[in-house]
Amino acid sequence: MSKISSWTCLWSAVACLSALHPSIGNSKDYGKPGEPVHLVIGYQPYYTQAWSAVIQKEMKPWEKYLPKGSTVAWEIGLQGAIVGNAMLADKNDIGYMGDMPTIVAISKRDVRELRMVAVLGLANDQCSVFLSRNEAPDFKSPEEAVKWWSDKRVAVAKGSCTDRSGQETMRKFDIKPAQYLNQNIEVQTSNFKAGRLDGSITWEPTASKMVMEGIAKRIGDTKMIGKLDGGFMAMQHELIKQRPDVVKGWLEAELDANLFWAKPENYMKVVEMAHRNTQGFSKEVLWMSMAGKYPKVMGGGDVRNIMYYGFDRDVENMIRDAAAFLHVIKVLPMAELPQDLVDASWTNEILKQRGLKVPLAKIEAQDPSKYPEGKINLPATWRE
């Protein structure tokens, strides 16, 4: 059992639940088109790339599009696999997740039929930020800094985007860590503090929290390997079949949320919404995770997130690469996802009706001096 990641076990538990309780696959009655509907949304305020859900929750653009009298309940998932499990157990109707948990969830059609229906974004440093302990040497580039990980203790959440990024980085640069550990973000944080960890890969906003609070230092992201990670929205297939009006309405509202977020003058408003939905994260940290510009030597770039909403060749290639990785590590039984599990028809139609194309926009990185609410205190590890 020790060789099996806890992330994989989490998914296995759902499969076992399905076997013991065949009723898990029963169809829910979502009502007839035009009738009020009640939706339960699984969302991740602790994953910056998925904050369009926070905008939906706080601003309620969905009220404009769903049938009058409809209601929405929100359930926080501390990681994507929790949201995916809730969807497989028919507890969430719509889920906002990172690439790996979305792909795994929709692949389990023997448990429940789910579909990927929209893209939250693609980025180099939303899901995979590379960190080293503060005492690590300062190097001239992210590539040199990550090579220091050879013979060191490195942690990722195995089976996640951080694992894929980690394994590809180690292959590319011939890095052989002394230990390649499976640790969630809480354990990584405590182990950096205790001096029991040399490097890790984690997602935003936890990455910025660790950097800005002086727990670890930022050394890079997936630009080193030329890869992008992504976030996606999944829906229950029964919802799609029974209530096309609700599916279209929710995705219309999702596009509104994306277009609001894409405007720099709204960045701080989005941060304030995220702040109301999280605990233990300052607004400065949340802003840095979403729009803060880190120096190049720390792996920073000019763009923090590419807002797609719909699907294109880049998104398809990212999904294909992620599925292939999950197959190699024996999480997926297939090397490629069946095409019908990704339903791009809804976003394609809405984008066409509005005269828009993907990608919609980019969240441009801003110098910390641009933070709207005063000076940000930069950590001692900050290097220009």
Regions found by a protein language model. Give the residues of each.
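Short, low-complexity disordered leader/linker segments with a strong preference
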Residues: 1-38, 360-384
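Conserved C-terminal helix/tail region of periplasmic/extracytoplasmic solute-binding proteins
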Residues: 320-384
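Short coil/loop linkers at secondary-structure junctions
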Residues: 68-69, 112, 171, 176, ...
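Short linear loop/turn motifs
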Residues: 72-73, 288-296, 337-349
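Secondary-structure end/capping motifs
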Residues: 243-336
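Short, glycine-/small- and polar/acidic-enriched structural segments
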Residues: 28-184, 191, 198-204, 227, ...
